[in-house]
Structure formats: structure tokens, C-alpha cells
């Protein structure tokens, strides 16, 4: 889960199985009284705290991207740098034409990391230095 992006169809299947288990359905014809997305909300926001698998999967992929960025001397980082972004940094890396599924999965989480570590300065009103 932390190296590969889980396909949406598989996530939907997991959510369906989990919802059926929660609602104690032995067959698929019973009513689910609350949408699964609402059950996945936090307990403070009237949810039950179930994990949203898509978000969790992206978080795990972002964690791998962060490891590659922060630890350039790791064997994994050196291999990926030599193979996919030898002339730049992790945040400048692109998918390329012959990228592995693991690398494409990690790059899917790259925008999450960019939003989290780079400041986007607008008019400067809300930035205090």
C-alpha cells in the first residue's frame, strides 16, 4: 500500500466489502443507511473514523516521496535518481516514457508534497516573516 497506487476499482471493492460488513449484510440487497464517505469522516465530524483508502494510499505514497527527497543517500533514492531524475531534484522529476508502476505511483503523490512544503506567496498579506 505504501509503494503502489491502488486502482480505484479495487478501492471501491474494498469499500463495498467494508460497508457490507459494517451493516451486517450477508447479501448485497440491503440498504446502507449512511454513505460510506460520511462514515469515513472523523469522529469529531459525526463520522465513525473509518479510513478513506484512497487518501490513506496517497499519504503512504507521499511518505515514500518524502523519504526519497530527504534522504538522497539511501540506496532507493540513488537508484531512482539515476533512473528517473538524474539531472534534477525529486520535485522536478517527470513520469517519462518507460517508468515503472512504483515510480508512477510515487509521482502521483508529488503534488501533495509540493503543496505541503512550498509556500505560494500571493500578495503577501497573510505571510509574516
Predicted regions and their residues:
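A helix-boundary/hinge signal
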Residues: 1-129
Amino acid at each position: 500500500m505504501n509503494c503502489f497506487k491502488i486502482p480505484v476499482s479495487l478501492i471501491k471493492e474494498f469499500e463495498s466489502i467494508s460497508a457490507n460488513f459494517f451493516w451486517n449484510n450477508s447479501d448485497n440487497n440491503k440498504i446502507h443507511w449512511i454513505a460510506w464517505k460520511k462514515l469515513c469522516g472523523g469522529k469529531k465530524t459525526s463520522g465513525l473514523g473509518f479510513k478513506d483508502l484512497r487518501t490513506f494510499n496517497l499519504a503512504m505514497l507521499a511518505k515514500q516521496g518524502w523519504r526519497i527527497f530527504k534522504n538522497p543517500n539511501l540506496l532507493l533514492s540513488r537508484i531512482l535518481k539515476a533512473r528517473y531524475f538524474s539531472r534534477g531534484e525529486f520535485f522536478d522529476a517527470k513520469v517519462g516514457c518507460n517508468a515503472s508502476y512504483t515510480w508512477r505511483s510515487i509521482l502521483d503523490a508529488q503534488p501533495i508534497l509540493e503543496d505541503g512544503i512550498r509556500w505560494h506567496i500571493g500578495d503577501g498579506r497573510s505571510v509574516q516573516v
